[in-house]
UniProtKB/Swiss-Prot annotation:
Keywords: Aminoacyl-tRNA synthetase, ATP-binding, Cytoplasm, Ligase, Nucleotide-binding, Protein biosynthesis. The gene is hisS. Homodimer. Its EC number is 6.1.1.21. Belongs to the class-II aminoacyl-tRNA synthetase family. Pfam families: HGTP_anticodon, tRNA-synt_His. InterPro entries: aa-tRNA-synth_II, aa-tRNA-synth_II/BPL/LPL, Anticodon-bd, Anticodon-bd_dom_sf, His-tRNA-ligase, HisRS-like_core, HisRS/HisZ, HisRS_anticodon. Transmembrane segments: none annotated. This is Histidine--tRNA ligase.
Length: 413
């Protein structure tokens, strides 16, 4: 019978990868909650219209990458390709704006895009992100960027660069859009097929061209910063000022526009040179118009998302691996029940314990304990059982001592 395998573009997270995933998730939870963010979980599928209106019908995500299907009720359903639109829907549907002036949320979950699978980019991938609703202050933009940078730094990831830009408002982008089209139309013959298609439909994405972006006529394109209105320019300048206060170094990148249409004002990416062409580790920005587009509510918002798989590729070997604190080695028929009671007693005191229920010799037990990288091994043989003691071996000091069973917890804690 043919073995059924995981679908192309998906993968199991097991072994060391699973340990990395748990570590990243735990660091995110602790850090985000320290900043006052609350966890929220949204469904992995939504009405297709949410993403068409939220992300933008002219984006690559909506045009080429969404997993969309009809359910048995003939409704068009899409597996979420990103989570911001879903969080906006959740925020509006549950009228959270009526309960609190400012809302801070974070999330962690699977997203789905039909892309060519490659290192760090799968068709099912995991994202961690956060969003702030109800606050327009540039201080919040700077805080969100700072949290993203410090999160990656906390994970031990180095060689990071923060890139920032402003894409203005719909009004200022309209003026800039015309100047951009005018500039690129004189270079149509030298542009890639995607850019020729985008020039009238989504001209800002021309700045993000991965094929010809290094050519001189791309580099000489007008900068959106020169077309920002006075209040938009002040907001951008204030974001930079508060980034300085947060101690975050940054580079201004006038070609940075992000790939989703809902962004306005501040946009940013955190990049590294360690991932080749997939250099962006984390990205986000402000999307003050999205809540009006999806729910007719004039509520500002800002946030970011990061791909967990890409972070996993960057993690060094010195991350905490969630290994058991204690391995229990029991020897002989009469010791297993007592060993089990010892294990439960330790677990009740928040001590991580591994116990193997199959009979083994001492050599096999030691080999297993070494592989699990536990600090302690509790050895319970027939002699120890009869005396009411155990042998406690500390692998970090190589010391071994006899202790009473009821005193194990005091020695280990």
């Amino acid at each position: 019978m043919k073995l059924i395998k995981a679908v192309r573009g998906t993968k199991d997270i097991i072994g060391e990868e699973a340990k990395k995933y748990i570590y990243i998730s735990n660091v995110a939870q602790k850090m985000f909650e320290n900043y006052g963010y609350n966890f929220v979980k949204t469904p992995i599928f939504e009405e297709t219209e949410l993403f068409k209106r939220g992300i933008g019908e002219a984006t690559d995500v909506v045009e080429k990458e969404m997993y969309t299907f009809k359910d048995r009720g003939d409704r068009s359903i899409t597996l979420r390709p990103e989570n911001t639109a879903s969080l906006v829907r959740c925020y509006l549907e549950n009228a959270i704006y009526a309960k609190e002036e400012i809302s801070r949320f974070y999330y962690n979950g699977s997203m789905f895009r039909y892309e060519r699978p490659q290192a760090g980019r799968q068709r099912e991938f995991n994202q961690i992100g956060l969003e702030v609703f109800g606050e327009k202050s540039p201080k919040v933009d700077a805080e969100v960027i700072a949290i993203g940078y410090k999160f990656l730094e906390k994970l031990g990831i180095t060689d990071l660069e923060v890139k920032i830009n402003s894409v203005g408002s719909k009004a200022s982008r309209t003026v800039y859009r015309e100047k951009l089209i005018e500039h690129f139309k004189s270079h149509l013959d030298d542009m890639c097929e995607d850019c020729r298609d985008r020039i009238n439909r989504n001209p800002l994405r021309l700045l993000d061209c991965k094929v010809d972006g290094e050519k001189d006529f791309y580099k000489s394109a007008p900068s959106i910063i020169d077309y920002l209105f006075e209040d938009e320019r002040k907001h951008y300048d204030d974001v930079k000022k508060y980034l300085d206060i947060f101690g975050i170094k940054y580079t201004e990148d006038p070609t940075l526009v992000r790939g989703l249409d809902y962004y306005s004002s501040t946009v940013f990416e955190i990049v590294t040179n360690k991932l080749g062409s997939q250099g962006t580790v984390l990205g986000g920005g402000r999307y003050d118009n999205l809540l009006k587009e999806l729910g007719d509510k004039d509520i500002p918002a800002v946030g970011f998302a990061t791909g967990v798989e890409r972070i996993m590729m960057l993690l060094e070997e010195n991350y905490p691996k969630n290994t058991p604190d204690v391995y229990i080695a029991w020897l002989g028929e009469n010791t297993s029940e007592t060993a089990l009671k010892i294990a439960e007693s330790l677990r009740d005191n928040d001590i991580k314990v591994y116990i193997d229920y199959s009979e083994k010799g001492m050599k096999s037990h030691m080999k297993k304990a070494d592989k699990l990288e536990t600090r302690y091994c509790v050895i319970l043989g027939e002699d120890e059982f009869n005396k009411g003691i155990v042998l406690l071996k500390d692998f970090s000091t190589r010391e071994q001592k006899e202790i009473k069973i009821e005193e194990i917890i005091n020695y280990i804690k």
